[in-house]
Amino acid sequence: MAPTRLQLGVRAAYSGFSSLAGFSIFFVWTVVYRQPGTAAMGGLAGVLALWVLVTHVMYMQDYWRTWLRGLRGFFFVGALFSAVSFSAFCTFLTLAITQHQSFKDPNSYYLSCVWSFISFKWAFLLSLYAHRYRADFADISILSDF
């Protein structure tokens, strides 16, 4: 079922806001706190949110109708980064527990864990929306083959 224009607008606005948040986390945790784990995962979350935004904008402009292979690529990229984010989450959680770090410390691996989960969320959403939009246009492409 195709989303309404309002749903697409809300999804695009949320993706845009989240990409700005991810990029700001990247810069703050790189420059101020010098915590590369949190900076990397925040930056990855920002890039993935931007990618989801591009997916929504291309759907609104009806660009995917002629390029369904691109949606398949977006799906696999989302699946790849889901695996990367999940493994980073497990790694940061293990490091935080074994090093007995505090929850309140901005340099702890627990914060990297949070941003790994947020990156996982955006990677999952990228795969989900690519799959849904591809299914939406697959019906149309079958009809256009005749």
UniProtKB/Swiss-Prot annotation:
InterPro entries: HRG (IPR026218). It is a multi-pass membrane protein. The keyword Amino-acid biosynthesis does not apply. GO terms for cellular component: cytoplasm; endolysosome; endosome membrane; lysosomal membrane; phagolysosome membrane; plasma membrane. Its main location: membrane. Heme transporter that regulates intracellular heme availability through the endosomal or lysosomal compartment. In macrophages of the reticuloendothelial system, is the heme transporter for heme-iron recycling. Essential for macrophage iron homeostasis, transports heme from the phagolysosome to the cytoplasm during erythrophagocytosis (EP). This is Heme transporter HRG1. It comes from Rattus norvegicus. The lineage of its organism: Eukaryota, Metazoa, Chordata, Craniata, Vertebrata.
